[in-house]
Amino acid sequence: MTRILLLLLRFYQYFISPLLGNNCRFHPTCSEYAKEAITTHGTLKGLWLTFKRIIKCQPFCNGGYDAVPLSIKNSKLFNKKI
């Protein structure tokens, strides 16, 4: 699953993103952030971090540098016992 997601992200970066232009308000870009988050934290946690990042990408956010956190152990979502 991880390889498929990374392949889709690479496809987006090389074929779709150039058509949209450089309009990302964050560094690294959201697609690069997604690749790093999925590689660092695995598929589920990486997708969760990517979702949170994309939600922040809106006109009321200044953007800027937003790196993938090294640890997300403080997240309530992933600490719940099922």
Swiss-Prot record:
Record-level GO cellular component terms: plasma membrane
Pfam (any one): YidD
Species: Rickettsia felis (strain ATCC VR-1525 / URRWXCal2) (Rickettsia azadi)
Topology within the bilayer: Peripheral membrane protein
Homology family: Belongs to the UPF0161 family.
Keywords, comma-separated and alphabetical: Cell inner membrane, Cell membrane, Membrane
Compartment(s) where it occurs, according to its Swiss-Prot or TrEMBL record: Cell inner membrane
InterPro entries membership: Membr_insert_effic_factor_YidD
Protein name as catalogued: Putative membrane protein insertion efficiency factor
Stated role: Could be involved in insertion of integral membrane proteins into the membrane.
